[in-house]
Swiss-Prot record:
Molecular functions (GO terms): DNA binding; DNA-binding transcription factor activity, RNA polymerase II-specific; zinc ion binding
Residues in the signal sequence: none
Protein name: Zn(2)-C6 fungal-type transcription factor FTF1a
Gene Ontology cellular component list: nucleus
């Protein structure tokens, strides 16, 4: 008989082997099966479990069949014993089976056969009755979950023979089956099925343990195992590459020493904590602090920064000019800006990257923005002022830089410094201050204040050694931040941020070493040498000789910063000693400025030979700028001593020596500016303009000196400085304010002279204008009205003052006379409507085309009652007239004679006076003189002797007009003069070349207005005992006209030299003076 085998790993019955052998000798069992055998043995009926059945073997040797025809009652009627239905149907007489053989087979097997298997006999089961129910032991409590009663022979379970891991006898069951554990009864532990499951006819399943239960240990053993578990967790957290390294390190077994006990001298297997962990601790301490995670280059913020840096290479490309303009403006930048304000960028590297197209667009935009003001290229030039040309490019660069303040890098830092300089030129005080502060913070974030040999921003633990050029670029960027901090913080209310002792880097090397990549050691700011070279390094050993213009310029500005801190930021009041004492801080600063100039190497001393050498190296402008700064320090220190003349206990010798040094330094600054003009080197640094302004304030005092030599030198040098300031205000807008301040100081001195007051005391009373004060003057830029039209100040409430006191609407008497009168709004339309008609009338009278800058119609239309108070402005000059109760001579003359606005040439016969023998050669006054305010009733001209010497006694009134109502003023087309034209042949004796001016510059009076007045008398005198100039005087003094003061503001709106057209006037003027003396 063959049956279907259903194999299940959970019910593999190894114990059935004995049962199969029991019936192996019975041949009848292998006969033809009954018809219902397949149906009875269908394995699908056994839902819970099934066993493999292969038929009965021969059972002749084990069982004797007495009656083959006897058929036992089928046991299939008992549903609880369906497992033996196959045997009942085959007609096997179970009652004749020998029990001894059966017991013997049970003893031979490792586990008793399953009662549901074919080898089991339900009738011989002691726990069941003839119906298959548990009758004998029904009251034993096993049906209720109690423990069954076992014989003593079966008391020893099979698992007791197993040994523990320690080799001892096992006393407890290692693992109970799931059913016994659920019923909370003792499990016999047999496999594959325990006795309880066999009796209950349920599957016996042993739960497979995923991990072995930890043995019970004491508390100290658990504490010892904790470091090992922590070490295993740490190993899982590190990368595989680090695991390979860590696997080679043996893990120490540490035995902690009990405190208070003496360690044994005998060797043990366990080491001490110091011996075991000391190498690992040292390696951990010296390891890099940056995380090393495989597959991750850094944190998310670092990834964002890298993405932004990648975008920086392309952002702003659409705003770039053409490649030709980029290269042109780059050359302009290195010619006019590099080295004078900041030593930024390496020209060979920049130009090479620019041609290859590998520069970030934001850097190119920044360079183009700051250099556009100095170019004359028609593709860049615009109709607006020069200092606003690059604003469009600067706006794009500014937007890119301000969005990346979180991720500092050298490119953005360089752009911030250059943009701060550009915003300085456009009078954006708030922007320049903010950009400078952001640049300083970014420089410290990049550790530029340290002289590092490796790039501190190295990622993934890689360190890149910096080349000499890169290290020098980093140093120069940090020094540029230092200079910007000194420039921006030179005001009264703006302290400096960077301390000198925080910068631990050497000073820049010479420019040729930097350009040609020649490493050389230099000194630090305090004179120390950080890295002295060895003889085998191949470097130049003399550190002082390796320093060029840039190094000593930084030292000069650093010293100026200390002087500013002492004089303007409260340190002067904290000095326990007065200025003239040797122990005072003032004397220390005075010694510093003298010693700094004396410490210059021979190659940097001022001489004509050194200037020629620097011209060959293209550093002549930097060389002159450095010497201007050195002289400015001397001037600044000694000017403070001049203002202390009224302090108690001051010595006269101290003040006189300080005055002498201040005048000498002011003269030296003017000489350097004149030398730069003559040698063709334009010193374009904004701070050089401030040095010229400081020198000008001293020259104004020199004009009133009783020493004739000092007076003449001051007049000539004052003209040089004013010319230079007029030129600088084209490129840097804040010099408009400085020129106005100079005009105000000049007017105060002139008023004091006329009033008979002490001029020196009055000139030194006001607080000195600081370089950083322009931030308060122009916090948010310069409007067109401030350099083209008079500014009208209208009181209005702002939202920021909403919680403050309400401002009064009325004016006091003092404010009425001192503050300007606002322009009437209702007259604006009248002014605009009448201006074109008057221009047409002027053209008809002149008979020649007139330039818009030559008309004064905007001033003629202002109401007569507001003329004496409102600040007037010369038409087309672009300058604002300031001062209390101002008086404009142009407006006064236009009111007195309506025909003064004509542009008829002063040399036409119709314009000549009948008293021709009393007239001099027509005077060509600079336009700034016409716009000057000399006080009420004064127009800057000198009246005849019959006038009284009183204040306001030199006014020009209408009664002095000439016969026939001839014009006392008439315009002149200065375009024709600048081009060398000679109107009516009267200017043939004058030089027509544009280079006839003081320093050979082109004439800049094209937008000015001429002034011609045939005098009523040839008898003139110099006011206030001023000597007439000599004929062999410098040509620059002959620009001023008949009054030595009138040459102060010569030069036209463009700031260039005025053609020397006053030679005949000076001769006639001297003649008139001699005639008056003989009269």
């Amino acid at each position: 008989m063959s049956g279907r085998a259903v194999l299940s790993p959970q019910h593999a019955q190894a114990s059935f082997d004995s049962g199969l052998q029991l019936y192996g000798d019975v041949p009848e069992l292998n006969a033809v099966p009954p018809p219902s055998h397949s149906a009875l043995m269908d394995f699908t009926r056994f839902d819970d479990f099934a066993f493999a059945y292969y038929g009965l073997p021969d059972q002749s040797s084990l069982v004797s069949l007495v009656d083959h025809t006897h058929t036992f009652q089928s046991l299939t009627t008992f549903p609880q014993h369906q497992a033996i239905s196959g045997l009942a149907h085959s007609g096997l007489p179970f009652g004749t089976l020998p029990t001894d053989n059966y017991n013997q087979s049970m003893e031979d097997s490792k586990a008793p056969p399953d009662r549901t298997s074919p080898a089991s006999n339900a009738l011989e089961d002691p726990t069941t009755d003839e119906f298959g129910l548990a009758s004998p032991n029904r009251a034993g409590g096993t049906d209720l979950g109690g423990k069954p009663k076992e014989d003593k022979a079966d008391a020893t379970p099979a698992w007791s023979e197993l040994k523990t891991k320690a080799g001892k006898e096992r006393k407890r069951l290692p693992l109970a089956c799931i059913a016994c554990r659920r019923k909370k009864i003792r499990c016999s532990g047999e496999k594959p099925a325990c006795k309880q499951c066999l009796h209950s006819c349920i599957p016996c399943v042993y739960k497979v343990a995923t991990r072995k239960a930890a043995p019970r240990t004491n508390c100290m053993a658990m504490l010892d195992k904790r470091p090992k578990r922590m070490e295993e967790r740490a190993i899982k957290a590190i990368s595989k590459s680090d695991q390979e390294v860590a696997s080679s390190v043996t893990h120490p077994v540490v035995k902690q020493a009990i405190p208070g006990t003496v360690t044994s001298s005998r060797p043990t297997k366990k080491r001490g904590a110091e011996e075991a962990f000391e190498p690992d601790l040292e390696a951990w301490a010296k390891a890099s602090s940056e995380p090393k995670i495989e597959g991750d280059d850094g944190s998310s913020s670092l990834q964002v920064q890298e993405g932004e840096e990648n975008k920086l290479q392309h952002e702003g490309t659409e705003a770039l000019p053409s490649r030709e303009i980029q290269e042109h403006l780059a050359e302009v930048f290195f010619e006019n800006i590099y080295g004078q304000s900041y030593h930024l960028l390496h020209k060979p590297s920049y130009m090479r990257k620019l041609k290859n197209g590998t520069l970030p667009p934001v850097l190119v935009l920044t360079v183009c923005a700051v250099a556009a003001r100095f170019t004359s290229n028609p593709l860049v030039s615009s109709s607006g002022p020069e200092f606003l040309r690059g604003e469009e490019w600067a706006s794009h660069a500014r937007d890119i830089c301000t969005r990346r303040y979180e991720w500092p890098n050298l490119t953005i830092l360089t752009c911030l410094l250059i943009l701060g300089l550009h915003e300085f030129g456009t009078c954006q005080g708030g922007r320049s201050w903010a950009l400078g502060g952001q640049a300083i913070r970014m420089a410290f974030a990049l550790q530029l204040h340290k002289d590092l040999e490796y790039d501190p921003s190295g990622r993934n633990g890689t360190t890149t050694q910096l080349s000499f050029i890169d290290r020098e670029i980093r140093r120069r960027i940090m020094w540029a931040c230092f200079l910007m901090d000194r420039f921006n913080s030179s005001g009264t209310d703006r302290p400096m941020f960077i301390r000198e002792d925080t910068i631990q880097i050497p000073l820049p090397v010479k420019e040729k070493y930097f350009q040609f990549d020649m490493p050389a050691p230099t000194e630090m700011l305090d004179g120390r040498v950080p890295h002295p070279p060895s003889p085998n390094d191949g470097q130049i050993a003399n550190s002082r000789e390796n320093m060029g213009v840039a190094a000593f310029l930084i030292r000069a500005i650093a010293l100026w910063g200390r002087i500013i801190t002492y004089l303007s930021q409260g340190c002067k009041d904290l000095d326990p000693n007065p200025l003239w004492e040797d122990e005072s801080h003032y004397m220390k600063h005075l010694d510093d400025v003298v010693n700094l100039e004396a410490s210059l190497p021979l190659s940097l001393k001022h001489s004509a030979e050194n200037l020629e050498v620097h011209k060959t190296e293209n550093t002549a402008s930097q060389f002159l700028f450095m010497h201007i700064c050195l002289q400015h320090n001397i001037l600044f220190v000694n000017r403070a001593a001049m203002s202390a003349r009224k302090q108690h206990g001051v010595h006269d010798d101290f003040v006189s020596e300080a005055s002498k040094r201040a005048f000498n330094a002011a003269n030296r600054i003017s000489e350097l500016l004149r030398e730069a003009e003559q040698s063709g080197c334009f010193v374009s640094a904004p701070f050089a303009g401030y040095c010229a302004f400081s020198s000008t304030t001293v020259h104004i005092l020199g004009i009133i000196s009783r020493n004739p030599f000092t007076k003449l030198a001051a007049q000539a040098n004052l003209t040089t400085n004013i010319k230079y300031l007029h030129r600088m205000k084209k490129y840097w807008g804040m010099f408009h304010w400085m020129v106005e301040n100079v005009r105000t100081q000049y007017r105060n001195v002139l008023d004091a002279m006329r009033a008979g007051a002490n001029v020196e005391e009055r000139a030194t009373q006001p607080s000195f204008l600081q370089y950083g004060d322009w931030f308060n003057r122009y916090p948010r830029g310069l409007s067109d009205a401030e350099f083209m039209d008079p500014a009208t100040h209208k009181r209005k409430d702002s939202g920021a003052d909403g919680v403050l006191e309400a401002k009064r609407e009325l004016r006091s008497v003092e404010e009425y006379f001192t503050l300007p009168t606002p322009r009437r709004v209702e007259n604006k339309d009248t002014i605009r409507a009448t201006a074109p008609k008057r221009k047409q009338s002027a053209k008809k009278q002149a008979g020649m085309p007139a330039q818009p800058g030559q008309h004064l119609d905007s001033l003629q239309s202002i109401d007569a009652d507001a003329v004496s108070q409102e600040r007037k402005f010369s038409g087309g000059l672009g300058l604002q007239i300031t001062g209390a109760a101002g008086f404009n001579p142009l407006a006064a003359s236009n009111q007195q004679s309506p025909d003064f606005s004509t542009t008829i040439s002063p040399t036409r016969p119709a314009n000549m006076t009948p008293f021709a023998h009393h007239a001099h050669t027509p005077t060509f006054f600079p336009p700034e003189l016409l716009a000057m305010n000399f006080g009420q009733g004064s127009n800057g001209n000198i009246d005849p002797l019959d006038r009284q010497l009183i204040y306001g006694g030199y006014s020009m009134d209408a009664s002095t007009g000439l016969g026939g109502g001839q014009d006392m003023m008439s315009g002149l087309g200065w375009d024709t003069v600048a081009l060398g034209a000679q109107p009516d042949g009267r200017l043939q004796s004058r030089p027509s070349n544009a280079k006839a001016g003081m320093h050979g510059q082109s004439a800049g009076m094209a937008d000015g207005a001429g002034l011609s007045r045939p005098e009523a008398s040839s008898a003139w005198f110099m006011p206030f005992n001023m000597e007439p100039p000599d004929m062999d005087q410098d040509a620059g003094f002959n620009m001023g006209g008949i009054d030595p003061f009138t040459g102060v503001f010569g030069g036209g709106g463009s700031g260039l030299a005025t053609p020397n057209a006053l030679g005949g006037l000076i001769l006639g003027h001297c003649r008139g003076s001699s005639t008056h003396s003989t009269r």
